């Protein structure tokens, strides 16, 4: 980070904001404070909003799921991008 960007401030990129949010969600989930289904719909809506800035997609084009196998958790995001 340069001194100029430090003094003037720098706007965070949407990718870094999304990464921070996912890290918070996963950390919260690992502590056992909420059921996984609680945040998945909100996460899906936010992802659609961010991706829609760059590619035209609908709510049905994006699917978010969380699977648990033993002590492994997998957050899966599937996005169907139109051919046009």
Swiss-Prot record:
| Pfam families named in the record | MinE (PF03776)
- List the keywords (alphabetical): Cell cycle, Cell division
> Where in this chain does the entry annotate a coiled-coil region?
none
Q: Does the keyword Cell cycle apply?
A: yes
Domain of life where this protein originates: Bacteria
Q: Which GO terms describe its biological process?
A: cell division; regulation of division septum assembly
The reply on keyword Cell cycle is yes
Described function: Prevents the cell division inhibition by proteins MinC and MinD at internal division sites while permitting inhibition at polar sites. This ensures cell division at the proper site by restricting the formation of a division septum at the midpoint of the long axis of the cell.
Would you identify the family this protein belongs to, as annotated? Belongs to the MinE family.
Record protein name field: Cell division topological specificity factor
